[in-house]
Amino acid sequence: MKYASFLALVGFITSTSAIGVSGAAEGFAKGVTGGGSATPVYPSTTAELVSYLTDSQPRVIVLTKTFDFTNTEGSTTATGCAPWGTAPGCQLAINQNDWCKNYQSSAPSVSVTYDNAGVLGMTVASDKTLLGSGSSGVIKGKGLRVVSGAKNIIIQNVAITDINPKYVWGGDAITIDNADMVWIDHVTTARIGRQHLVLGTSASNRVTISNSYFNGVSSYSATCDGYHYWGIYLTGSNDLVTMKGNYIHHFSGRSPKIQGNTLLHAVNNYWYDSTGHAFEIGSGGYVLAEGNVFQNIKTIVEPPVGGQLFTSPNSNTNQACSAYLGHVCQVNGFGSSGPFSQADTGLLSKFSGKNVASASAYTVAQSRVPSSAGQGKL
């Protein structure tokens, strides 16, 4: 009996000591440590998870199950609108801040019933690591918010799903706004009402998004075709964003939209299957795209480009990257996709002196990303 107890104790210690962040952030959030060497904690209830995320202590928070927030804060029935029609596959809109009245005044009014927990995500305080264990760490019905000066945060190997998918303004999966040093890695998002990822108008500074799976398959969409429109929105006033090794699948727009004052390094990602556009670049959006794969993307970048774009068009032009990124930029790969050729070399100097992610040939992303991105793929 004592021997069996000893073995159980050894097993627990081994399991606990093995918990930790896998790898390290590349690119702009290089050096992020999250909760560091804090003793791991294992929430068992939604309330306990919220408490660990919001307190002032450095934390390593390990998720070993699904935390379902559905119905934890009740529901609301109200009058919304139907900007894209009332067909079964069309999203409806919650009238948040009189959005229907101010922006969709001609849309018919409809009754909407949504889950309150999804509308506003959980706040994540500074110095936190949020880790999923294996394929078990799931947050359902509520997102995460890194805001109000929060910094030094790692979110790894977690799935965020089912946030009022029928309704625009039903909630975002991950919000970052007025933050710094945030690393999102091996995260899966699916069936989200609004944005899968949004960086708000305040400065979010240094952010790396890597090896994540943004899944746009949905029963409801603004384009009424099962392709989610509200993908990734980067609109901060002073943002440096690295996107590397992500799988961006089944969207019809905003994947990503970039504006404000945002420098995006999109490297070795895989865009697959879009009925609309991938990039939407507004004023103040600066995008360098290299070593990516675009497969079945009808419109890679929506015209006109309001900011600046360097698409790494050919080996000769790509030599210009060396002086600022420390490597020759890699060409992108295309299959059944629209054109993507622009070379605003002036934006390259913005990378000078910064932590820049390495780049591989697009064939590496083509072979690895679909099978390695997202939760449970560490």
UniProtKB/Swiss-Prot annotation:
Its EC number is 4.2.2.10. PANTHER family: PECTATE LYASE 18-RELATED, PECTIN LYASE A-RELATED. One of its GO terms (molecular function) is pectate lyase activity. Disulfide bonds join 81-100, 90-224, 321-329. It is found in: Secreted. SUPFAM superfamilies: Pectin lyase-like. This is Probable pectin lyase A. Keywords: Carbohydrate metabolism, Cell wall biogenesis/degradation, Disulfide bond, Lyase, Polysaccharide degradation, Secreted, Signal. It comes from the Eukaryota. The gene is pelA. Belongs to the polysaccharide lyase 1 family. Pfam families: Pectate_lyase_4. It catalyses: Eliminative cleavage of (1->4)-alpha-D-galacturonan methyl ester to give oligosaccharides with 4-deoxy-6-O-methyl-alpha-D-galact-4-enuronosyl groups at their non-reducing ends. Pectinolytic enzymes consist of four classes of enzymes: pectin lyase, polygalacturonase, pectin methylesterase and rhamnogalacturonase. Among pectinolytic enzymes, pectin lyase is the most important in depolymerization of pectin, since it cleaves internal glycosidic bonds of highly methylated pectins. One of its GO terms (cellular component) is extracellular region. InterPro entries: Pec_lyase, Pectin_lyas_fold, Pectin_lyase_fold/virulence, PEL. Residues 1-18 form the signal peptide. GO terms for biological process: cell wall organization; pectin catabolic process. The active site is at 254. The keyword Disulfide bond applies.
